[in-house]
Structure formats: structure tokens, C-alpha cells
């Protein structure tokens, strides 16, 4: 915002703003009155910049697009890796992710899980009974932080007899959960949107797609 303010005072028009990871993108609403940051505040910051075009890589919430604050998101990062080997069964962690991403796939075997939080540290996941055992499945979502959802999904898939499981998330936040997930998932694909993961020492089955240099 300081840079935008300098540009405004100098009469410089910001024509293009590209954001790899939009902070607070998951906070569609305030869960507590004393939370310091929410999507509404981020919206005001972006409006203040007055850029002619704003592109965001895989924002969790589409509100900023529907409200005309950002023009559109970058293409999902599948488009950055042409010819990638994608399992024909794709599982989304919830219905919201299904509606965001299912248009990317031209096959019918796409599913979504339903999640129920039993306690602060325990998550129950239910999967569609149509998922067949001994099949290859890709779990796809926008963000992995603590990884709880993906640990629960893997266990649920194991209980159904599915062991060839792959994970792709656009934004990876913490290293420790990634490393632990790599012991379960056959491959994990992330981007360097949040952090320079390509410069970190990671297990061999974690692949980093560079969305910026």
C-alpha cells in the first residue's frame, strides 16, 4: 500500500498487479469479533491500489471476483504443467472445491468428500461409495496448512482399499505437515506461491511448480 500511495502521489497509474498468494484469502467472514484480519479488509487494500487489472493465483474465495475487485484468477496450476499425468479419479475435499475445480476435468470420475469436525483436533471424512478400491486417485485443493483434512482423507481412502493416492495443492504453508503427508501420498505437487519451496530440502516425491522466479 505504501508503494501504491507513492505511485498515486506521483500521478503514476498501476496497470497490472499479480498476486501469487493472497493473504487472508480463506477468511470469507469473521469467526470472532477480535480477529485482526478478514477478507473485507483485504478487499479495501486491493481497492486502494487502484490497479487497472489484478490477477490472483487460485483465491480460496470467489467473492473478490464476483464483487469486481479482481478481474479473474490465474488458471489453475494444471495449466502450468502441460501433459502432466493426472489420475482419472479426482477427489475434492469438499463441495466448494468440487464446484471450483471440476470444470478443469473432462472425465466423469470426480468426487467430493464431506467433512465433519468432531473436535478441535479430530476430523471425520465420509467418501462417496462409488469410489472403487485398488484405483488411482488424485486429491486436489487450493491450500494445505496443517494438513488435517488430507490426513483424514487418506485414512478414509485406505479404509476403502485405495492406496495409490496423489495430492496436488496450489498453496503450501507449513513444511512439517507436507513431509508427514509425503509418507502417505505417492506424490505431492505444490507451487512456490507462498514460499520458495523449490529452494527447500523436501522429500523426493514432493514436486514444486514454480509460478514465479
Regions found by a protein language model. Give the residues of each.
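PRPP-associated nucleotide enzymes
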Residues: 1-213
